[in-house]
């Protein structure tokens, strides 16, 4: 018998189809007469003995349930181990078993053999006359009888009622899902995606490519890396992930550094936000890694000589409260997430703004973080400008001058520089900086070169069409030198790694 599971241009169901292929391949190892193939638009399954096939698939589903959906944890009050589902799993608990252990309500996970028999019986039943057939909401194909109506357990994008039991509303025509799509959707929870729990919400990262073969090849590159035994995060240490963009930054660094990914895989990530509340109305965002940012990451990582873009750059940045002289951890984590987002979305202007000290807080950049920041600046912006590299020293030294002026006056000049909208406003702020610099005493100017501002003026006039880019570079170097000048030896003892 031959069955086809076709893609339907839906990220959840199509990933489920690719996941079925992975399951079928496992079955092949035990039964050579069972064969599966993956094509760009479908997965083909061939078998002779359906009972033998279902028996083995049921065993695999049972294993996946404990590997991917459920986890054992000690009860905080009693200290007794109990079985709980991971927080983002949108499947209800069922009745506890005879030992008082939690189970899942979906029968395919509680009694996989019987339920798989029912599902494959429906799949292999030929449709009757078209008048009595139903149309699947996901794939659009006709089928005779559903295994279950669509609900959030099999398709998370449905709008939920409080009981988590179905779709809100009474639209009878918008709840039918064929047995094939149900099977793909319900087993997608046992697939190789990324997840991260953040207390009030969880993120699920689902990769997508319209070509199932390419999707399968991409997922094969990272499956072994995922720590699926962790309840809260399967991408490294849970406490070192601050949000969805820092998670992706860490993940792509792994792909480049460990999985030796040389080219941007052209994957669209569907990021599902699951609220930690009774009504699970989810939100789906998309992210696609741009080729330019992938190149910057690859080049920068290749230059690090043992350092880590994530561990030594991102985790080497802190916000410190000036008055209390201590790390402000909530703000630090928000800053790291914001920097990750600005970088991955190719927004250098936004990236620069995150380094501006504000509200009686200053930013600490550890030595390694500063070195890596400079590499990012060069690979991301300076090379793109096409300006000879020797002119970069003019920008850096001018940033040092601005930092010295700001430290001994106030940060208003830096804020003014950040807000300029025209080249005329830019020149006005630079004249004000020059006037303030003259008032500095000899002790304060011995580590800067005031004459460099003349070179800066010549540089900006020569490349005036790029004055905004040069302003951004000047600004981020000013922030970097302000961080150096505000640095205290005890800051180096604050480490969250």
Name each region found by the language model:
Residues 223-483:
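Intrinsically disordered, low-complexity regulatory regions
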Residues 486-489:
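Eukaryotic acidic, Ser/Thr-rich intrinsically disordered low-complexity regions
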Residues 80-232:
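Basic, glycine-/proline-tolerant helical and adjacent loop/strand elements
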Residues 193-196, 238, 492-496:
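Acidic, serine/proline-rich low-complexity intrinsically disordered regions
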Residues 3-6, 11-13, 32, 36-47, ...:
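Hydrophobic transmembrane signal anchors and adjacent membrane-proximal interface regions, especially
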Residues 1-134, 145, 425-431, 435-445, ...:
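N-terminal alpha-helical interaction blocks
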Residues 5, 11, 24, 47, ...:
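Phenylalanine-focused residue identity feature
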């Amino acid at each position: 018998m031959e069955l086809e599971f076709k893609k339907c241009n839906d990220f959840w169901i199509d990933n489920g189809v690719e996941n079925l292929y992975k399951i079928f391949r496992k079955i092949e190892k035990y039964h050579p007469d069972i064969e599966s193939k993956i094509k760009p638009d479908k997965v083909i399954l061939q078998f002779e003995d359906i009972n033998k096939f279902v028996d083995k698939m049921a065993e695999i589903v049972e294993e996946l349930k404990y590997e991917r959906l459920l986890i054992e944890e000690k009860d905080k009050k009693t200290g007794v181990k109990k079985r709980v589902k991971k927080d983002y799993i949108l499947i209800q608990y069922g009745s506890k078993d005879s030992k008082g252990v939690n189970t899942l309500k979906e029968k395919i996970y509680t009694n996989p053999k019987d339920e798989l028999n029912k599902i494959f019986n429906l799949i292999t039943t030929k449709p009757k006359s078209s008048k009595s057939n139903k149309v699947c909401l996901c794939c659009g194909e006709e089928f005779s009888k559903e295994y279950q109506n669509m609900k959030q357990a099999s398709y998370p994008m449905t709008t939920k009622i409080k009981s988590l039991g179905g779709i809100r509303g009474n639209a009878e025509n918008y709840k039918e899902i064929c047995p094939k799509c149900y099977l793909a959707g319900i087993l997608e929870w046992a697939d190789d995606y990324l997840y991260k729990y953040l207390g009030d919400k969880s993120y699920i990262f689902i990769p997508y490519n319209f070509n199932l073969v390419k999707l399968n090849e991409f997922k094969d590159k990272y499956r072994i890396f995922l720590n699926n035994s962790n309840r809260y995060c399967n991408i490294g240490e849970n406490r070192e992930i601050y949000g969805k963009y820092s998670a992706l930054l860490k993940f792509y660094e792994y792909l480049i550094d460990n999985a030796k990914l040389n080219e941007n895989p052209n994957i669209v990530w569907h990021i599902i936000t699951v609220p930690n509340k009774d009504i699970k109305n989810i939100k789906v965002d998309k992210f696609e890694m741009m080729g330019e940012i992938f190149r910057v990451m690859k080049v920068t990582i290749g230059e690090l000589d043992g350092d880590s873009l994530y561990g030594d750059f991102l985790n080497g940045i802190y916000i410190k409260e000036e008055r209390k002289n201590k790390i402000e951890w909530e703000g630090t984590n928000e800053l790291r997430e914001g920097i990750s987002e600005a970088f991955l979305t190719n927004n250098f202007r936004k990236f620069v703004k995150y380094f501006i000290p504000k509200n009686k807080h200053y930013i600490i950049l550890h030595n390694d973080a500063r070195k890596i920041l400079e590499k990012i600046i060069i690979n991301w912006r300076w090379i793109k400008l096409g300006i000879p590299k020797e002119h970069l020293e003019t920008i850096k030294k001018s940033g040092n001058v601005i930092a010295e002026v700001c430290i001994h006056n106030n940060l208003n000049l830096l804020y003014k520089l950040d807000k300029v909208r025209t080249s005329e406003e830019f020149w006005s702020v630079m004249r004000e900086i020059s006037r303030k610099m003259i008032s500095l005493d000899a002790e304060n100017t011995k580590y800067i070169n005031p004459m460099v501002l003349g070179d800066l003026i010549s540089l900006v006039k020569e490349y005036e069409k790029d004055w905004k880019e040069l302003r951004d570079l000047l600004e981020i170097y000013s922030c970097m030198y302000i961080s150096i000048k505000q640095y205290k030896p005890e800051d180096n003892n604050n480490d969250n790694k």
